Amino acid sequence: MGEARILILTASIGSGHTRAAEAIRTALKARPGAAEQQIDVVDFMSREVSIIHYLMKRIYLTMLRFVPNLYDVFFRIAGKKTSGGAVRAAFAWVMMRTMGRIIRTYQPDLVVATHPFPEGAAALWRIRHGEHFPLAALLTDYALHAIWFVHDVDAYFVATEEMADEMAMLGFDRRRIHATGIPIVLSASRLARREARVQAGISEELPTLLLMGGGLGLGDMDATLAALEQVEQRLAILVVAGRNASLEERARARGKHSHHAVYVSGYTHDVPVLMHAADLLITKPGALTISEAFAAGLPLLLHDPIPGPETENAVYATRCGAAVWLHPGERMAPAVEDILAHHLPVMRRAARNCAREEAAQRVAEILTEMLQRK
């Protein structure tokens, strides 16, 4: 067949879509025959790909930061059967020219999208120009949303069997829907807690909290750190500030005056190690972060979800028994104390039961089969 060209299209809106793409690439490269494959990951929303896409991303992120309720309105409109198709088609039409340039550059034998924007644009380009490359879509949340619903996609990868069944009820071919789980990189899947704590630089044997706000450092981390000062028991607190340099600086300054042992890092690839070192993760409910916590058997305390997808993710993780959802008005310190004192063992078991550690490998296997059938 010669060298097979696989194109993975992602979007740097948060870090979850990109992390899922990297997990797929890692799993594909680990398979037999990987030497005969060229695997490219392209950020569809980067400045280098399209200045228009990049500006759309900046508007989106500004909306999330300053007017999240407006995003909630958009999410709900795009999620309706009547209006979702129109929203999806509008984005696909605007982005189709850029998609054509990418397709001509990479000449893919298979395209995988980890975000609905490139998914819709690739599907529209394929129809308009008579292309025949297989197209797969990876949904990166624990609930369905109509903006993903493109009937011309050859394979869907979803997080749960319930999502697959729901798509089938909506008229999608069940044979094309694969409940693989959400792909993650398993760089620390068998790391013992003691070894992880050594790698994380934790010198004291203390109950350990991991604080994350997503790859963009969103979430009120300052308020979280202030609230944790009300926990009387001394803690080790691992703070991951993401790409938010200002937040990282403020967290370091606050840590100098805390009665807890505070360790601060910016964007890091060592999150799996930190998860294995921690007893509890305090975070916004991004689906990739939740999936990584499940794989580490790490209980979660969830707060401040982005209206829409993160709210659905919080519902799922809480329903699984692996998470506690801190709603507005509820105090963080008592919740942390209660979890540490009474619920960790049960929540750890629930997290492990929810884990789909082989998701990336299963996705890679199915993609390889699609290439072989081409």
Enumerate the predicted regions with their spans.
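Nucleotide-activated sugar donor-binding and catalytic core shared by glycosyltransferases
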Residues: 1-242, 246-374
